[in-house]
């Protein structure tokens, strides 16, 4: 069974834990209890393939930022979460993305942009803004509500699909490189 290491990143209070717990336990946690770091595992079937999701729910608070490099190193894919009623959390996404790319030493890291709390009427981040940002990054965008469960499965499953595409691309690139190294030389 394939295991996928997913990491949920974003500013404090955007609902990273609420999304993760909604996926894992099917219930909404409405009290805010800042996370230091929590790990969850769940077996799911995505596109007919049974797989194990190993999800790391991370601290959004700045005082835990030193831990970020470590979990970013081990993650295969990242849910970059902001709250649709918090413009600052949306602006912070750029910093998380840059840090992920730096730590992974790659421009091409599987990510999904997630606009959480879409059940709230007090939107400050327009859907089009988020779609434009995701398009500029070349990643999918999904609006979610941990409260109503809207888009929760879709966000995590889309990330798994992005990881699969990435792995497939990497193995094709690897085969191309191997073929290139098998050139024969003649010494005269």
UniProtKB/Swiss-Prot annotation:
InterPro entries assigned: P-loop_NTPase, Small_GTP-bd, Small_GTPase, Small_GTPase_Ras-type
Maturation-removed propeptide residues: 186-188
Lineage start: Eukaryota, Metazoa, Chordata, Craniata, Vertebrata
Family matches, as PANTHER family: RAS, DI-RAS, AND RHEB FAMILY MEMBERS OF SMALL GTPASE SUPERFAMILY
Keywords associated with the record: Cell membrane, Cytoplasm, GTP-binding, Hydrolase, Lipoprotein, Membrane, Methylation, Nucleotide-binding, Prenylation
Organism expressing this protein natively: Meleagris gallopavo (Wild turkey)
Annotated residues for binding of GTP: 10-18, 29-35, 59-60, 116-119
Gene: KRAS
Domain of life: Eukaryota
Keyword presence, Transmembrane helix: no
Record protein name field: GTPase KRas
Activity regulation (UniProt): Alternates between an inactive form bound to GDP and an active form bound to GTP. Activated by a guanine nucleotide-exchange factor (GEF) and inactivated by a GTPase-activating protein (GAP).
Family to which this protein belongs: Belongs to the small GTPase superfamily. Ras family.
Membrane topology recorded in Swiss-Prot or TrEMBL: Lipid-anchor
SMART domains, sorted: RAB, RAS, RHO
Enzyme class, broadest EC rank: hydrolase
NCBIfam families noted in UniProt: small_GTP
């Amino acid at each position: 069974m394939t295991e996928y290491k997913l990491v949920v990143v974003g500013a404090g209070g955007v609902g990273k834990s609420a999304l993760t717990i909604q996926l894992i336990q099917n219930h909404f946690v409405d009290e805010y209890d800042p996370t230091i770091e929590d790990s969850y595992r769940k077996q799911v079937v995505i596109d007919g393939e049974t797989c194990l999701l190993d999800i790391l729910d991370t601290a959004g608070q700045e005082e835990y930022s030193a831990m970020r490099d470590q979990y970013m190193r081990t993650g295969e894919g990242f849910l970059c979460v902001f709250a649709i009623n918090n413009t600052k959390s949306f602006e912070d996404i750029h910093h998380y993305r840059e840090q992920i790319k730096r730590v992974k030493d790659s421009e091409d890291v599987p990510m999904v942009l997630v606009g959480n709390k879409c059940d709230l009427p007090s939107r400050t981040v327009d859907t089009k803004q988020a779609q434009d940002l995701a398009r500029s990054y070349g990643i999918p965008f999904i609006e979610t509500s941990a409260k109503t469960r809207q888009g929760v499965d879709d966000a995590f499953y889309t990330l798994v699909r992005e990881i699969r595409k990435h792995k497939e691309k990497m193995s094709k690139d690897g085969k191309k490189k191997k073929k290139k190294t098998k050139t024969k030389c003649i010494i005269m």
